């Protein structure tokens, strides 16, 4: 699977797993479809999907070879609007991180657009398809309720120290650790609007599990420079890219 990511470390293998669409993601928790809708905050549970155009089968589109070749996703067929989910991942051994998320999303999900910044990652697609993708991202090893945050705005906190419960900082306090149950609850949607009832996100992963699943190189975990294969490949790409830019011949 070297085409997905180089390296012989566990971190490198975890990156390959996320980016390989044939790898079956481990399911770690159960979140209902209704709770996913609440977390996203784009429509009310049970509300019809708002549309931006008629269903494709009702549209009189001109003949196009590409349109005939490519099967549209369900939301495009129905005329759904485009919506998003955005994650923030703690630098303290979160399972995923922004660039890995984007690579993985583009390998795994059709009809979706991924955008990456240093501390956040967004995926946009048609609304009903987004809900399916979001459910998978929230229920599987992509997500830890303490070290991963669902944040549509005010995302800061990925590089800050964890609190006494091991939770990543969130200025809007969307995800709260319940000390009575030992579980994390989402009390606001990704935008920061308060929910009528909290959504149970499950127990935080323990430190050993996080260290085993993380895609983040750290000197107090697996150091990047110790993964010789990954370093050599990345240096080769950087050198050839630089040389090609200066002298394409």
From Swiss-Prot:
Binds 2 coenzyme F430 non-covalently per MCR complex. Coenzyme F430 is a yellow nickel porphinoid. Methyl-coenzyme-M reductase is activated when the enzyme-bound coenzyme F430 is reduced to the Ni(I) oxidation state. Coenzyme M binds at residue 120. One of its GO terms (molecular function) is coenzyme-B sulfoethylthiotransferase activity. Component of the methyl-coenzyme M reductase (MCR) I that catalyzes the reductive cleavage of methyl-coenzyme M (CoM-S-CH3 or 2-(methylthio)ethanesulfonate) using coenzyme B (CoB or 7-mercaptoheptanoylthreonine phosphate) as reductant which results in the production of methane and the mixed heterodisulfide of CoB and CoM (CoM-S-S-CoB). This is the final step in methanogenesis. Its EC number is 2.8.4.1. GO terms for cellular component: cytoplasm. Belongs to the methyl-coenzyme M reductase gamma subunit family. Its main location: cytoplasm. This is Methyl-coenzyme M reductase I subunit gamma. Its cofactor is coenzyme F430. The keyword Repressor does not apply. MCR is a hexamer of two alpha, two beta, and two gamma chains, forming a dimer of heterotrimers. One of its GO terms (biological process) is methanogenesis. Keywords: Cytoplasm, Methanogenesis, Transferase. Pathway: One-carbon metabolism; methyl-coenzyme M reduction; methane from methyl-coenzyme M: step 1/1. It is an enzyme of class 2 (transferase). It comes from Methanothermobacter thermautotrophicus (strain ATCC 29096 / DSM 1053 / JCM 10044 / NBRC 100330 / Delta H) (Methanobacterium thermoautotrophicum). It is found in: Cytoplasm. It catalyses: coenzyme B + methyl-coenzyme M = methane + coenzyme M-coenzyme B heterodisulfide.
């Amino acid at each position: 699977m070297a085409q997905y990511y180089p390296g012989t470390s566990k971190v490198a293998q975890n990156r390959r797993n996320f980016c390989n669409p044939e790898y079956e993601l481990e399911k770690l928790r159960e979140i209902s479809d209704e709770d996913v809708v609440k977390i996203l905050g784009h429509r009310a549970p049970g509300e019809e999907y708002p549309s931006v155009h008629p269903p494709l089968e009702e549209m009189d589109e001109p003949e196009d070879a590409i349109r005939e070749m490519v099967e549209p996703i369900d939301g495009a067929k129905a005329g759904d609007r485009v919506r998003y989910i955005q994650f923030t991942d703690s630098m303290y051994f979160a399972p995923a991180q922004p660039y890995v998320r984007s690579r993985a999303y583009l390998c795994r999900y059709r009809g979706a657009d991924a955008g990456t910044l240093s501390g956040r990652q967004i995926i946009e697609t048609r609304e009903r398809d987004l809900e399916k993708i979001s459910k998978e991202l929230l229920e599987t090893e992509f997500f830890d309720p303490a070290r991963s945050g669902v944040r549509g705005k005010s995302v800061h906190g990925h590089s800050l120290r964890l609190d006494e419960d091991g939770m990543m900082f969130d200025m809007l306090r969307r995800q709260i650790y319940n000390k009575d149950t030992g579980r994390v609850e989402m009390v606001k949607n990704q935008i920061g609007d308060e929910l009528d009832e909290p959504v149970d996100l499950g127990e935080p992963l323990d430190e050993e599990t996080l260290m085993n699943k993380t895609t983040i190189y750290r000197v107090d975990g697996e150091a990047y420079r110790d993964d010789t294969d990954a370093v050599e490949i990345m240096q080769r790409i950087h050198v050839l890219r630089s040389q090609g830019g200066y002298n394409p011949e």
